[in-house]
A protein has these predicted regions:
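Conserved alpha/beta-domain cores
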Residues: 2-160
Length: 160
């Protein structure tokens, strides 16, 4: 357990310092898109100026056979599409899936500076958030990110 005096210290050597104030930007519209669908990805430049958040969905809306293609498509979007003032978020696979670790590792190390928030679905308790927070700090340090990626926990179960 971390002491309160350490709250604003990075969780890993070389990780970006945690934000002292959460940046609040009102969000009227979040557009979810499937990164493995090339037709939808082609429409993103027209959609981006009309939304506050663009969210690449890697979770339940993506069939198991398309998980890796969706992850690669999301990273390609993060690297190549001009987001302007629109935030880029992603909803990764749940922590009990075989894809969650690969999602987090690839997103942060290959395109981390492009992402504002990572949604963690099906959070069961504080231990899930602590795990992802610590892992994210290590990956941010490894990738030498200039800013931390924020987490958005989704509580979807009776325990969560």
């Amino acid at each position: 357990m971390r002491h309160a005096r350490d709250f604003f210290k990075p969780l890993a050597v070389g990780a970006p310092e945690p934000l002292r104030d959460i940046p609040f930007r009102p969000s009227r519209m979040i557009h979810f898109f499937p990164p493995s669908n090339d037709k939808m990805v082609a429409k993103l430049p027209d959609i981006i100026p009309t939304v506050d958040i663009l969210l690449g969905n890697l979770e339940d809306g993506v069939p198991a056979s398309d998980k890796e293609a969706a992850r690669a498509g999301l990273i390609r979007v993060a690297r190549t599409v001009d987001m302007g003032a629109t935030q880029l978020w992603t909803r990764v696979n749940s922590l009990d899936s075989p894809w969650a670790l690969d999602d987090l590792t690839a997103i942060v190390t290959e395109a981390g500076n492009a992402f504002d928030v990572i949604m963690i679905p099906k959070v069961e308790g504080p231990e899930d958030i602590h795990y992802v927070d610590r892992l994210l700090a290590q990956l941010e340090a490894k990738a030498r990110l200039s800013k931390p990626i924020l987490l958005h926990a989704i509580l979807e179960t009776a325990r969560g």
